């Protein structure tokens, strides 16, 4: 099936170079030419074998559409075919995942082959310099830019574009790839090498499966040596639906860490991640990783995490409130969560906060393959009105409060019940992580604040002014991480 990748209705003749222009770019004849996303109508030439193939297939998502997030399709070369001398990519737009395009061209084209990119510049794309990033990605994958506009473009009206690149004779040191499901075992080997413990297939699926995340890898001599991953996070930014790319599983093989340069595998994968999945990003990096990323111009700090810890309180029942353990099998519980989430969202219309509806809580906590969390509603004993939700995890000696879903005014009551549960469970304390700009809401019930040396970055690689809107605006807790 052919998919419509353009966001603008244009005639194919407006954006395609002429057959004679393409023939002029052929390295040698006889030659093979692929019209990727175009038709062979009118393409007849001596000594040239011309084929056509769809650029992508309907619903073959490299980035699944969801709420505020637009879908991006995976480019797919024919499984069987020759090593083409020229590939003309028709109707290229942000609807096509550029790394899926270039990683296949890098593998399938012979040295000296030419790639011609054609299309119409989109109106108001998420990444304003989208086409520049597509070309830069091609260069990182081993292609040299021959002409920014394909020579004489007098016959091609603006905003149409043509970009011409040629594959280098020598392959780049690192092969860059969009991660696909079959790559999980090799990435797991890198994870073990870097972190010293394995990542299970189930945990990998929980993070990245079913369109929940994406990643970029760099390989050398067939082995994955770097990985830059992220999970999609639906957020409310000043009360409006948005999405951000939550960075996780940033890995570089120990033998490659000496190449921490602007052409090294870490920066290559991180830059591609920012250019494809930007401009809004965040994460919870280790201090050393944050320092390196700042020096390379990838990250800038927009906040940091702190810990608040409380002593247990009296275990007696509270006269005004009671507790209710939530269940995924009760629809009333789902509606309860969604209701208090709407109240919380209304209190945070001047902030940035990840969605905390039932669908999110179920996926984040109840679907986790290894950790056990308890989702507990605090309810008015007299009216039955839900006041908020606690997400708790019992540890060896304490209780972690990973998340709250509640209007701000209910936080003291929820924290009191969390302290009571710590006493009932025989734990010495209860604690939470919260962004420092929100900690004043938690300094109740005798809470004691300490720093945890975790900065919150924003992605500044693309120099997009939207990246700075998060400064001292995030509401993040330890449940927002992928590792707690």
Role assignments for model-derived ranges:
Residues 35, 39-76:
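Class I SAM-dependent methyltransferase SAM/SAH-binding core
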Residues 141-143, 150-173:
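Core SAM-dependent methyltransferase catalytic element
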Residues 11-31, 42:
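Conserved alpha-helix/loop element of class I SAM-dependent methyltransferases that forms part
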Residues 249-252, 257-275, 409-421:
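Conserved acetyl-CoA-binding loop-helix of GNAT-fold acetyltransferases
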Residues 232, 279-327, 374, 382, ...:
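Active-site/acyl-donor-binding loops of N-acyltransferases
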Residues 26, 183-229, 237, 276-277, ...:
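Amide-forming acyltransferase catalytic core, primarily the GNAT-like/NAT-type
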Residues 76-87:
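A short acidic, Gly/Pro-enriched loop at the edge of an enzyme's catalytic core
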Residues 99-114:
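A short glycine-rich, Lys/Arg-flanked "PGG" loop and its adjoining helix->strand segment in the class I
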């Amino acid at each position: 099936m052919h998919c419509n990748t353009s966001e603008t209705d244009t005639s194919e003749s407006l954006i395609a170079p002429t057959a004679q222009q393409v023939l002029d770019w052929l390295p040698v004849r006889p030659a093979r030419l692929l019209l990727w996303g175009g038709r062979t109508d009118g393409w007849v030439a001596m000594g040239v074998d011309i084929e056509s193939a769809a650029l992508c297939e309907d619903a073959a998502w490299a980035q699944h559409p969801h709420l505020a997030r637009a879908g991006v399709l995976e480019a797919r070369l024919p499984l069987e075919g020759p090593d083409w001398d020229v590939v003309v990519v028709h109707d290229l737009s942000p609807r096509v995942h550029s790394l899926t395009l270039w990683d296949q061209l890098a593998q399938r084209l012979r040295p000296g082959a030419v790639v011609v990119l054609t299309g119409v510049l989109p109106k108001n794309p998420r990444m304003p310099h989208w086409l520049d990033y597509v070309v830069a990605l091609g260069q990182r994958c081993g292609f040299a830019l021959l002409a920014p506009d394909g020579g004489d473009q007098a016959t091609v009206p603006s905003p149409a574009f043509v970009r011409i690149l040629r594959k280098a004779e020598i392959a780049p040191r690192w092969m860059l790839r969009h991660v696909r499901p079959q790559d999980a075992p090799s990435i797991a080997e890198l994870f073990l090498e870097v972190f010293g413990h394995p990542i299970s297939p189930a945990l990998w699926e929980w993070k990245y499966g079913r369109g929940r995340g994406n990643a970029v890898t760099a390989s050398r001599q067939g082995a994955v040596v770097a990985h830059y991953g992220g999970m999609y996070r639906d957020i409310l930014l000043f009360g409006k639906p948005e999405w951000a790319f939550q960075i996780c599983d940033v890995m570089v093989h120990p033998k490659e860490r000496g190449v921490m340069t602007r052409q090294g595998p870490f920066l290559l994968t991180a830059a591609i991640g920012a250019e494809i999945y930007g401009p809004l990003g965040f994460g919870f990096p280790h201090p050393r990783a944050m320092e390196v990323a700042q020096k390379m111009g990838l990250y800038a700090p927009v906040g940091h995490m702190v810990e608040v810890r409380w002593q247990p309180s009296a275990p007696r029942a509270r006269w005004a409130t009671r507790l209710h353990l939530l269940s995924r099998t009760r629809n009333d519980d789902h509606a309860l969560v969604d209701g208090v989430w709407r109240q919380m969202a209304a209190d945070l219309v001047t902030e940035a906060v990840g969605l905390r509806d039932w669908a999110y809580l179920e996926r984040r906590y109840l679907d986790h393959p290894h950790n056990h969390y308890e989702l507990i509603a605090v309810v008015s004993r007299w009216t039955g009105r839900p006041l908020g939700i606690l997400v708790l995890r019992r540890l060896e000696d304490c209780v972690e409060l990973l998340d709250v879903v509640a209007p701000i005014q209910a936080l003291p009551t929820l924290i009191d019940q969390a302290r009571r549960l710590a006493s009932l469970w025989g734990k010495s304390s209860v604690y939470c992580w919260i962004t420092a700009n929100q900690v004043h809401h938690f300094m109740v019930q005798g809470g004691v604040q300490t720093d945890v040396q975790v900065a919150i970055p924003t992605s500044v690689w693309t120099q997009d002014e939207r990246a700075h809107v998060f400064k001292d605006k995030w509401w993040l807790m330890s449940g927002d991480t992928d590792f707690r």
